[in-house]
Amino acid sequence: ANELISFIASMSGEGNLRVEENLGEGYVRLRVSEAERRQAKHDIQHVEDIVIEMLRNARDAGADKVYLATTKEDGVRTLVFLDNGSGVPQDMQERIFDARVTSKLESMKMDRWGVHGRGMALFSIKQNTDEARVVTSGVDLGSAFKVSVAADRLSERADQSSWPQAVKDEDGRYVCARGPH
């Protein structure tokens, strides 16, 4: 597979190739600019950003059921995610937290939170937390992930557990003015 990548690079020019390394089982390491690599550290600003990125990953893995359990003990927030998505092969369970590793070579998505599928979300989570790992997973069996972070390392949004409050905007439509959006 790496020979194929080398051949394509020699024919099309190194700059046109999106794949740096084929990791097998549908996973690749993408090329990325230094600016994107440095931005990864700033992609995760709050605990809620972790939840959003993990939900996006579950969605992209085909999960239609995702469960989240959370605790906070001695200043450490622990999140456990369970999903019924496509799963992570055993030999990729540590590598998916490396920069630019993705199974989404042809399916990068743009949604309200930005671009997803560059292989940077799990890397960003790992860079900004004390622990991020696959607890268990199997191909077509779903996955369980655990993420732990000290409250003084990554904050939680102040309104994360407040009740939503709807108010009318200038056009008379109800919008969420307070609480989770």
Positions of the model-derived regions?
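N-terminal assembly/transducer modules of large multi-domain enzymes
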Residues: 155-181
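Acidic ATP/Mg2+-coordinating residue in the GHKL
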Residues: 83
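Short beta-strand element(s) in the Bergerat
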Residues: 75-79, 143
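Glycine-rich G1-box
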Residues: 86-87
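Conserved ATP-binding N-box helix of the HATPase_c
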Residues: 41-73, 125-126
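Hydrophobic/aromatic residues in the conserved F-box-adjacent beta-strands of the Bergerat ATP-binding
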Residues: 68, 79-80
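Flexible ATP-lid and adjacent glycine-rich G1/G2 motifs of the Bergerat
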Residues: 90-146
